[in-house]
UniProtKB/Swiss-Prot annotation:
Segments traversing the membrane: none
Main localization of the protein described in the UniProt heading: cytoplasm
Classification of source organism: Eukaryota, Fungi, Dikarya, Ascomycota, Pezizomycotina
Occurrences of domain CHCH (ranges): 28-71
Name assigned to this protein: Cytochrome c oxidase assembly protein COX19
Source organism (scientific name): Paracoccidioides brasiliensis
Function: Required for the assembly of mitochondrial cytochrome c oxidase.
Sequence motif: Cx9C motif 1, positions: 31-41
Any GO BP annotation: mitochondrial cytochrome c oxidase assembly
Region (Disordered): 1-22, 87-107
Family recorded in the similarity comment: Belongs to the COX19 family.
Cell location: Cytoplasm; Mitochondrion intermembrane space
Primary gene name: COX19
Motif interval(s): Cx9C motif 2: 53-63
Keywords: Cytoplasm, Disulfide bond, Mitochondrion
Length: 107
């Protein structure tokens, strides 16, 4: 009795890389304290990923990016933008716009 494809041939299946590139393990435990805090937060919340836990996830990913364990990525693309982040971005763009308008020569 043979198993597999007809004719008894073995089929080679090539593994596919992750969609966003490699995600190396944190062997040195550089970000371990943050991920343990995140997991405790999830446990306290009964598995609900509320804003407090999401902020911990953001700091974990930021730590991974800082230690070159993950390619730098905009948090907006990762779905980790919060109200205070939006306010800071709006204030920064408003001050940049005001500064550029003050530099314009008046006619």
């Amino acid at each position: 009795m043979s198993f597999g494809s007809p004719g008894g041939r073995s089929v080679n299946i090539k593994p596919k890389p992750p969609e966003r590139g490699s995600f190396p393990l944190d062997h040195d435990g550089e970000c371990k304290f943050i991920i343990s805090s995140y997991l405790q937060c999830l446990k306290k919340g009964g598995g609900v990923n509320d804003e407090t836990c999401r902020k911990l996830a953001k700091s974990y990913l930021s730590c991974r990016m800082d230690h070159n364990l993950m390619a730098p990525e905009c948090f907006e693309n990762l779905g980790l933008v919060f109200d205070e982040d939006k306010k800071k971005r709006e204030e920064a763009s408003a001050s940049t716009t005001a500064a550029s308008e003050s530099k314009k020569p008046s006619t």
